[in-house]
């Protein structure tokens, strides 16, 4: 898998990534096209998915990855030694289904290497490609989704409130 075909590097603004003692942002490494470190030496991978086209009444959730990073990287680091690589944002496809395929492939790629992936942004509709990425490798899935609302609606259409 050629990551650079799937990803847009995240370039943190200096005020976002705090190098203040103990802040998480000071310990995160950032992937870009010039990245030369051993990719799989990292334990945790972060990817943003700026996709909101099927998010009912919340199309702007596609802007969430970078907003979440602002708060996440300002948190204090815990007493653990896991290494973290921020892969940037997944390139969204011409069609939402293209984004789903790319996300599923990225998840499968990392799951095969037994890596932990934290997905930022997007709507609940992203649960399906994340699940399929795990299922295609035969893994059980531990999943947590943080949201302001519980979204349960009946219907056959696949969107963010049909879960």
What are these regions (language model features)?
Residues 2-46, 53-163:
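Conserved alpha-helical scaffold segments that buttress catalytic/binding sites
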């Amino acid at each position: 898998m050629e990551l650079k075909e799937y990803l847009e590097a995240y370039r943190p603004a200096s005020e976002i990534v705090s190098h203040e003692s103990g802040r998480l942002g000071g310990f995160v490494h950032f992937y870009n096209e010039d990245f030369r470190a051993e990719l799989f030496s990292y334990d945790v991978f972060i990817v943003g998915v700026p996709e909101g086209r099927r998010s009912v009444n919340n199309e702007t959730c596609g802007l969430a990855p970078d907003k979440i990073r602002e708060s996440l990287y300002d948190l204090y680091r815990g007493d653990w030694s896991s290494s973290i690589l921020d892969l940037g944002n997944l390139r969204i496809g011409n069609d939402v289904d293209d984004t789903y395929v790319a996300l599923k492939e990225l998840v499968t790629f990392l799951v095969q290497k037994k890596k932990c992936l934290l997905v930022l942004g997007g709507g609940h509709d992203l649960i399906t490609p994340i699940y399929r990425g795990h299922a295609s490798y035969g893994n059980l899935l531990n999943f947590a989704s943080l949201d302001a609302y519980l979204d349960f609606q009946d219907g056959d259409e696949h969107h963010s409130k049909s879960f």
